[in-house]
Curated annotation (Swiss-Prot):
EC number annotated for this UniProt entry: 2.5.1.78
Residue positions binding 5-amino-6-(D-ribitylamino)uracil: F23, S57, W58, E59, A81, V82, I83, F114
Domain of life (superkingdom): Bacteria
EC category name: transferase
One example GO MF annotation: 6,7-dimethyl-8-ribityllumazine synthase activity
Annotated protein name in UniProt: 6,7-dimethyl-8-ribityllumazine synthase
GO annotation terms (biological process): riboflavin biosynthetic process
Binding site for (2S)-2-hydroxy-3-oxobutyl phosphate: E86, T87, R128
Biological pathway: Cofactor biosynthesis; riboflavin biosynthesis; riboflavin from 2-hydroxy-3-oxobutyl phosphate and 5-amino-6-(D-ribitylamino)uracil: step 1/2
One cellular component term from this protein's GO annotations in UniProt: riboflavin synthase complex
Amino acid sequence: MPKVFEGQLSAAGLRFAIVVSRFNSFITDRLLGGAMDALTRAGADPELIDIVKVPGSWEVPLVTGELARQHRYDALICLSAVIRGETPHFDYVAGEAAKGIAHVSSETGVPVAFGVLTTNTLEQAIDRAGAKGGNKGFDAAMTAIEMANLLRTLRQAT
């Protein structure tokens, strides 16, 4: 019978950092609220949660990398919102932010949850930040909790 590994959804005793962009703060503040709601519902101690605010999505990977290399956190949560405009700026920012965040996780071994909204319209962003489409900040925090526990289990099993 194969052995199955799966992360638990308890945040008790885990340390988190949330990197959140100030740009589009009317969206990112809602994402942050959703993430904090998920963490506290799952038993996280607010004293073990650090919130780091950066100017925009472009800066998220740099700060996330710095925090991951400190190895003080069980998981990191990245929150920002990139909304398509009339220029190609969206494509550069959204793509590079996603690549940078993925790189941090794979290079450091620290789970990094992706709560970066990339939407075509403001309405879509609002929907995904707590209106019709749930709250992607909440979802990202739950992913961070699960991955922190899964990696802890896998590292203890070897």
